[in-house]
Amino acid sequence: MSQRKRYSLNVVTSPSIPSPTPSAPIRTNESNWEAASPASAASSFLPNVHHGGTVLNPGLGIMRSPSLNKSGAFGRSGSSGSSTVIEPSNIKLLLIGDANVGKTAMILSYCRELLTRAEMSRSVRLRHQQQQQHKDLGLKKTVVNHRLSMKEKRKRYSSNDFEKEFKDINHFADETSDFGNPNIGDDNNHEMADPNEIVIETRSTIGIDIKTNLVNIDNRFFNVILWDTAGQERYQNAIIPSLYKKTNAVILTYDITNAKSFQSCMERWIVQALENFSSQDLLKARFFLVGNKIDLYKERQVTHYDVVQMVQEMQLKHGIKISGNFEVSCKWVNVVERTMNMIILDLVENGCFENNDPCVSITTSDDVQGHEQEFHDTVEEPFNFTRQRQHQLEKNNTVDITKPNDDIANNQSICCV
């Protein structure tokens, strides 16, 4: 009885077949989106309504938008280049003249990079504070390092050695605090100075310095490139050929307190410019004469008569025209800026710039005057638009007893009424 086999009653049932999971049809051809109806497309993305014992509202189907990889989906421009960014046109200004006439200061003044006396003192004070912070930080690190080294080696030293180490640290701290603590100017000497006065502290140019400035003229941008050249002859031999290439304006700079620099413009600089200009670049170049340091008018050595005489002599001797004559001071920012703007406007009006916009043609003031003259020559007589007013003859209802009354209807004259 103990070995009797026991059986259990198991009901054999068919295995449950899982319901198919909903799968969204993958449409590879984008043209099928237009062919499929909205109802069928919405129902294809809906799960089985009886699956899981839940019923979903068919109106909540999620529609996938077609791919936006088609051309023109995002309004992109084609390869025609219509959406390319137009670069601003270039205007090259070349400043030449003797050394120490103020070419660098003029460029910095136009770019507003010269500091006033208050800004200069503030920058010096800030620089001194930064240096002092670095020195204090270095001193703290030195003291900490000494203490750590002493702590590591305290068993190797005696009390006399500790006293010696502390004396060395104090001596080093005193030297560091005293070092690099210069007096920032004499406050008594600068109490009466104007804090808004521009301080001109420039160094002699070695080679070439280039500054750029972007200007907007009638909603058109121009990239003004200012070339600052070295006045000393030893720095010019290697760079002369590349100076005058594609130059639009040559600014002859001189010092009104130095007659020698004024004569050099006639005897040296204008000759050098004409020798190195190519015939093509010379057609688009204009010459200007600028005198600097008019704030030192009491020390003037170059008079206005000398300037006018030199301009006439340049036109007769070299056959060039001086397009403008100016006098500026780098300490007066508005004067330098107005002078440079007048030079730039003159260049733009005469088409002396490198046009980077192919859609805009260069039109000079001479061309405009030529078209106006041609228009006036074609018209022999002026247009006289006169309008004559015609008066309608109204019949007079009054009767003049001194004249016979004409009967127009019967073509007869009646003496009386």
Curated annotation (Swiss-Prot):
One Pfam family here: Ras
Lineage, highest ranks first: Eukaryota, Fungi, Dikarya, Ascomycota, Saccharomycotina
Molecular-function GO term, any one: GTPase activity
UniProt superkingdom: Eukaryota
Record keywords: Endoplasmic reticulum, GTP-binding, Lipoprotein, Membrane, Nucleotide-binding, Prenylation
Family: Belongs to the small GTPase superfamily. Rab family.
Lipid moiety-binding region (S-geranylgeranyl cysteine): C415, C416
InterPro entries linked to this entry: P-loop_NTPase (IPR027417), Rab (IPR050227), Small_GTP-bd (IPR005225), Small_GTPase (IPR001806)
Annotated signal peptide: none
Residues that hold GTP according to the record: 97-104, 228-232, 292-295
Role according to the record: Involved in the positive control of both endoplasmic reticulum (ER) and mitochondrion inheritance during cell divison. Required for the MYO2-dependent retention of newly inherited mitochondria at the bud tip in developing daughter cells.
Cell compartment(s), UniProt: Endoplasmic reticulum membrane; Bud tip; Bud neck
Topology relative to the membrane: Lipid-anchor
Region annotation (Disordered) ranges: 1-34
CDD domains per record: Rab (cd00154)
Gene Ontology cellular-component annotations: cellular bud neck; cellular bud tip; endoplasmic reticulum membrane
Summary of subunit composition and partner proteins: Interacts with MYO2 (via C-terminal tail domain). Interacts with YIF1, YIP3, YIP4 and YIP5.
Descriptive protein name: GTP-binding protein YPT11
PROSITE patterns, sorted: RAB
